[in-house]
Amino acid sequence: MAKRVAIVGAGVSGLASIKCCLEEGLEPTCFERSDDLGGLWRFTEHVEEGRASLYKSVVSNSCKEMSCYSDFPFPEDYPNYVPNSQFLDYLKMYADRFSLLKSIQFKTTVFSITKCQDFNVSGQWEVVTLHEGKQESAIFDAVMVCTGFLTNPHLPLGCFPGIKTFKGQYFHSRQYKHPDIFKDKRVLVVGMGNSGTDIAVEASHVAKKVFLSTTGGAWVISRVFDSGYPWDMVFTTRFQNFIRNSLPTPIVTWLVAKKMNSWFNHANYGLVPKDRIQLKEPVLNDELPGRIITGKVFIRPSIKEVKENSVVFGNAHNTPSEEPIDVIVFATGYTFAFPFLDESVVKVEDGQASLYKYIFPAHLQKPTLAVIGLIKPLGSMLPTGETQARYTVQVFKGVIKLPPTSVMIKEVNERKENKHNGFGLCYCKALQADYITYIDDLLTSINAKPNLFSLLLTDPLLALTMFFGPYSPYQFRLTGPGKWKGARNAIMTQWDRTFKVTKTRIVQESSSPFESLLKLFAVLALLVSVFLIFL
């Protein structure tokens, strides 16, 4: 009899979890509280409780070749960075292609998930759900929690003295949908993550004046990177990751700063991150520098005090310390919680949960509950969650045996202590992980990591493409369980799909003898690098 698996949420990770269960002979039942799949990527005009909320203009921050499911590329005619409506269409195509809808119960809220009385023996869970006013209970052999971490807004009003006296409008960025509400208003956006920056830029097209308040600053990069390539196809490669992790942290930090400043000097715009040693995810925005230099967005430091109709900033430089404000948007992030789980199952402290490999509660007697997608890699979340799901089902099936509880708890505690070995980038913030290192570790565990040295002997072109080219998800399907016969072709044609939607006019490309000579030297240097790295 197939093991029954309860899956909470039908977003990108939930859909991947359903597919992984079906592929491995498990029996999944996915509970989705709304009336459709898609999670974060399904736009609605109104905020829905318990669901991530996005604004109308959201576009993916990771390009289509890097943010697809590993055995299901985006359609070739999709833009490289996908608008939310098309991303949702893609998820629906995925669900149709692999017959996932039959495993989803829509309009069903998970009320509670508790251990069965014989949990220490069976590892089973009782799942209580609510559907159209009717409460139901069922027993499952395992549970996969795929609710994400963008549903509970973090709004620390106590950190902003005087906010209760403010006569204007203020709200969390989760409530934002369209820029029309800012027309002819003086707007302050607090927080410089991707959402805060997007909102400030959008508001600047209709508002009277826009201020963006940041305490720690941030690196800002464009989706359009070196030579017009998508940023993550250039930045996220095995070769670059090898170089970054082999150098002392101060050198890596300097190199990263140099690269980030190649678009514009962040110091001249008041944006340089306060802490450059601990890696902070860069902000993706194609317009911000242009809006700042044309006087449409003004960067300000942290808020000192909020008055009835104005805001006072601390340590303002070359500018008034007080500005009249009509609307304040708090883009202050999110907290995460699992209201349907007892704290003894997954305890959240200081923005972290004690999860082995960011998946399994380290203290559970039986590894039958997994949290999928509760991680912040410097890479796409979709293939990360999918790889976590592939790993998880192998644990559920007993193919992978987790280490003793003491070993898992020790690893989790070491991660929480923010220890750093002095080499490579410093991933010391809660939930942060090195994207390539993390996924390679999971792939190794399920025997799905490609052996580049063997490939160098049998298929050298593929090996070199994988090492020096983008770390695209298709690499995760070359071997092991879930192997996809189209993986090699997808890897070798990824640049063709990238340029198909941009090369819409025939142009004459000519190269000088000097350029040809440079390319020859580049090839020779590449071969020497391969020899040194692999031997």
UniProtKB/Swiss-Prot annotation:
E.C. numbers: 1.14.13.148, 1.14.13.8
Transmembrane segments: 514-534
GO biological process, one term: taurine biosynthetic process
UniProt binding sites for FAD: 9-13, 32, 40-41, 61-62
Entry-linked Pfam families: FMO-like
Membrane topology, from the record: Single-pass membrane protein
Binding site for NADP(+): 60-61, 195-198
Tissue-wise expression: Liver.
Reaction equation(s) it catalyzes: hypotaurine + NADPH + O2 + H(+) = taurine + NADP(+) + H2O; hypotaurine + NADH + O2 + H(+) = taurine + NAD(+) + H2O; trimethylamine + NADPH + O2 = trimethylamine N-oxide + NADP(+) + H2O; N,N-dimethylaniline + NADPH + O2 + H(+) = N,N-dimethylaniline N-oxide + NADP(+) + H2O
Site feature Important for substrate binding, where: 208
Any GO CC annotation of this UniProt entry: endoplasmic reticulum membrane
Cell compartments where the protein resides: Endoplasmic reticulum membrane
Cytoplasmic side: 535
Record carries keyword Oxidoreductase: yes
Single GO MF annotation: hypotaurine monooxygenase activity
SUPFAM superfamilies named among the record's database cross-references: FAD/NAD(P)-binding domain
Primary location group: endoplasmic reticulum
Membership in a protein family: Belongs to the FMO family.
Protein's name according to its UniProt entry: Flavin-containing monooxygenase 1
Organism of provenance: Oryctolagus cuniculus
